[in-house]
Amino acid sequence: MATAGKVIKCKAAVAWEAGKPLTMEEVEVAPPQAMEVRVKILFTSLCHTDVYFWEAKGQIPMFPRIFGHEAGGIVESVGEGVTDVAPGDHVLPVFTGECKECPHCKSAESNMCDLLRINTDRGVMIGDGKSRFSIGGKPIYHFVGTSTFSEYTVMHVGCVAKINPEAPLDKVCVLSCGISTGLGASINVAKPPKGSTVAIFGLGAVGLAAAEGARIAGASRIIGVDLNAVRFEEARKFGCTEFVNPKDHTKPVQQVLADMTNGGVDRSVECTGNVNAMIQAFECVHDGWGVAVLVGVPHKDAEFKTHPMNFLNERTLKGTFFGNFKPRTDLPNVVEMYMKKELEVEKFITHSVPFSEINTAFDLMAKGEGIRCIIRMDN
């Protein structure tokens, strides 16, 4: 493309301070260096992780910064050594990477790349420790290696999944983070047998995706557990068959679920990050074969306490990261699940706004309205 090797000036939504509305700025985006790609973002969406680090209540603030990590775009140019993707390829940026060289990437079991796994404290490129974004010569920090709230962004090639160009980017962009995380937690990690009973703790976007995964796997009962009963009706669209609101019961949730399921559920997936919900999700699975999967990220000081007999009685506890999907290897297959109509993505998308109104997406999330809001970069 004519812009290859040159600095590109474009619009980006910049966070200058914690919790303050993003402002539209003209930024300069440097060309990609070795093993990097520059991508024209067409659609992006807002994830809770963006909001968490934008609020910067529980971690070191890093501003000014360009947030965003759920997106779809087209490769504009590539740096030296890049062979996997070329200009014009349709891609999904991913907050965690796959270098394909480290022990994790070579393992059939792990997706936790040594080089490119998520690092929320790094605001620069891994290659040279510099930012590719600037305003008037002043660097602007990156976010989780993606920074998709910009018309153009630069990423390590290991954080870019090349997908079917026929796939609509305004739909499949949501597969680059939360939806795949929940889906994979069910189909790759919990692996519910056909006809089994699954409990999903937390019915936000990730929990609904976990329910969708359980539905795809053939679970016959999918029990949604949430303190917000308003979410229940919507969750039926994602396969939930019944619901438990802990506020409606005097017994512990794990006992309520055991009573409903003749001793415990076959699988549970915990998507809240609340350590008490994690304990409940583990203790509600059936002895002998029950498997609980933890997806939600707990508070840094949280402690998980349960009696060792719960393990000795043959309950299994697993953790997962990005649904155990390897980004470059597996995400193209998730997109194909959508293309084959095995996975419904449209029902996750409840709102859409032009890029100039990106702060509306933050307002919707703050109010708990909707599931995913698509941000259209072309307005």
UniProtKB/Swiss-Prot annotation:
Residues binding an alcohol are: T49, H69
Single Gene Ontology BP annotation: formaldehyde catabolic process
Catalysis performed (reactions):
a primary alcohol + NAD(+) = an aldehyde + NADH + H(+); a secondary alcohol + NAD(+) = a ketone + NADH + H(+)
Q: Where is the signal peptide?
A: none
According to the lineage, what is the superkingdom? Eukaryota
What is a GO molecular function of this protein?
A: alcohol dehydrogenase (NAD+) activity
Q: Which UniProt keywords apply?
A: Cytoplasm, Metal-binding, NAD, Oxidoreductase, Zinc
| E.C. code | 1.1.1.1
Q: Which Gene3D superfamilies match?
A: Medium-chain alcohol dehydrogenases, catalytic domain, NAD(P)-binding Rossmann-like Domain
Cofactor note as given: Binds 2 Zn(2+) ions per subunit.
Cystine crosslinks: none
Protein name, entry field: Alcohol dehydrogenase 1
* Species annotation: Hordeum vulgare (Barley)
Q: What is the lineage of its organism?
A: Eukaryota, Viridiplantae, Streptophyta, Embryophyta, Tracheophyta
Gene this protein is translated from: ADH1
